[in-house]
Amino acid sequence: MKKNKRTLIFALTLTALSALASCSGGGNSENPDNPGDGGGTTTNSKHQYTATKRVNEYLVKEGRTNYKIVISEESDTQLNYAKNELNTLFGEATGVTFDFVYDTKVTYSDSATYISLGQNAYLTSAGLDKEVSFSTYGRDGARIITQGKSIFIFGATNFGTLYGVYDFLKITLNFECYYEDCYTLDKNVKDLSMYDFNVIDIPDVAYRQRRGLLYPTASQNQMFPYRMRVTDDVNMLFLPIYENGPGSAYNTNHNSFFYFPEKQYKTTDPDFYSVAGNQLCFTARGVPERFEKMTDIAAAKIEESLTFNSVAKAPTYTTAFLGQNDIQDYCSCEACTKVRESHYGSACAPIIIFMNRVGKKVNEWMALPENAPYKRNLNYSFFAYLTTIVPPFKQKADGTFEYSQDIIPDEGVNLMPYVASMNFDYGRPFYSDENKEAREILKTWGNFYPGAWSWTYGGFYNDYITFFDIYSFYEDFHSYLKNYKYSLSFEQVKNDQRGADPGFGGLSNYVLCKKNWDSSLPMDTLINDYITNVYEDAAPAMREMFQKLRLWFAKLIEKHGIGAGGQMQGDISSNAKYYDGIGFINELFDLCDDAYKAIEIYKKDEAKYKRLSTYIDIEWLIPAKVAISCFEAKYLASDFIAMKTKFKDICIELKIKDIKEFTSINSYLESLGV
């Protein structure tokens, strides 16, 4: 097959997701994998927090303010959140709340004292709409500008406005959110200076997938994901593919057999399936007529979903996704083997060729006048995962690519890989030698498809009540995504856990949210800030507990090598070989006891004591799970029953959902017999 050389920037038609990502600066001179090979140059232009206090000018003076909030009469959810969060948190800090006025009722003047939220007529009357390039902000980028005596907080959308409010509160009142019920905020502020703001704050990763604790339970703070600036859910982006028509079962993830249900096609069209029968054959055994029939069926499935989920009904769907089954296998037929061998051994090549053909057919269908209500700028996405992780192209040292022409999409077909990197060792630093090959693969996909999506891991998926050290790996990961222009990141970690996440899951959630937004933030600083502000007087003991767990984990990785791929499936807390006796577990219990003692001074403040003791309870579950599973003989019967009772009570009270991936904790709690 003819090979072509291609420069780094090529003429793929990109969707809005891709365009947003292309605003990112690239490159990192400290990282050995970026010798100027297409990553660009590092810039801090996305995060500028210039704010200078004015002399003898005040937002609040002696507990009073002259300022009002200006908003548009045409509001949306995010703008409502922005005004409510500003008023609520500002009021909590100062005792002052703002009156509201609609933008059509006021006109800008240098002496007017307003805080303007979002794009509105007041911003236009100040002339700022002509001075700002909204296209560079993406969906979430925030801008804060002082002009005259007015402050303008806005973005290209009101997501940016909301995040700008959080920046404003951070600068003026030290607001920082750590956990669903824990944030810092200055209190009893009677005098607050006016600032000259010139703030730009644009996320390094444009779209950030929610996970775990970012899905609050009904009793938790529903603003938590917004305060952490992570609100995306790919289920709101992916068209559902229905097994047997709208209203039937559907899948948006590993959904290839929803496109081609076995009951419908396995007997009549066996060539649609792999030789082993557990995946699709994306070449239909190399028979052109069968390939056309297969792509017709897949296109019809997408068209069916587009029709049922019209733009007016479901505007968030941007992507038609076809995901292989979640197993280490691919079709071994002669035709698929030939395609792989002619595309650098990539099992993803047949999928890309298939999706390009499907995308062309769906685009032609959407272009028909009668289908105007269903027309979207649609991505056609696929997994690069497990056996399909290797790209079907090769990047050369000069930044150009060698590839086969048949993987280049037809005009208007937006192909988008979802790179699910099970091939990393998440227990080791991102720049470790063990992760070199996986880094190269991630970089190559990102360079060939600017705006690609990333799915990563880092957890023991058969054991949710234990500790996994993600911090060395994710220290440098998000800057790599930024450099190579990825537009979405999903760090799975313990994605389906709810209520609470033992193993310092609150901390891991915090640092992942922060690094997604600004990848330059130092990991150690984030860790220390979280522990200091969440645990307060118990911080020294909890910091030592965290450090001991990191040391234990490092030994675990070196001795057992269980931080990579399928090796992350181990049941850790139920296996005594990982602990070398009960001594380490007793050390963790002792540190929890020290932490409980440190907060006894707050017992008269019932709410605060309960909050702090709950944070300690969550991590107490780690040694308790090991002790219950492995060391019953080391305890008096009464002490062992008390331990199991406390374990069960904590899990029930906090509504902890899972004991391991896809498995409720309820059966385990019942098995405790207390």
Q: Where is each model-derived feature located?
A:
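Acidic, contiguous N-terminal accessory segments
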Residues: 34-143, 189, 193-199
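Feature activates predominantly on carbohydrate-active enzymes
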Residues: 77, 82-85, 89, 93, ...
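C-terminal motif of bacterial Sec signal peptides marking the signal peptidase cleavage site
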Residues: 19-22
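Aromatic-lined carbohydrate-recognition surfaces of secreted/lumenal glycan-active proteins
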Residues: 355-394, 451-461, 489-492
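Catalytic domains of carbohydrate-active enzymes that cleave complex glycans
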Residues: 512-674
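Structured mid-domain segments that build the active-site/substrate or prosthetic-cofactor binding neighborhood
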Residues: 282, 286-296, 304-313, 433-552
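Substrate-binding cleft/loops of secretory-pathway carbohydrate-active enzymes
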Residues: 380-422, 465-472, 501-507
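Bacterial N-terminal signal peptides that target proteins for export
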Residues: 1-10
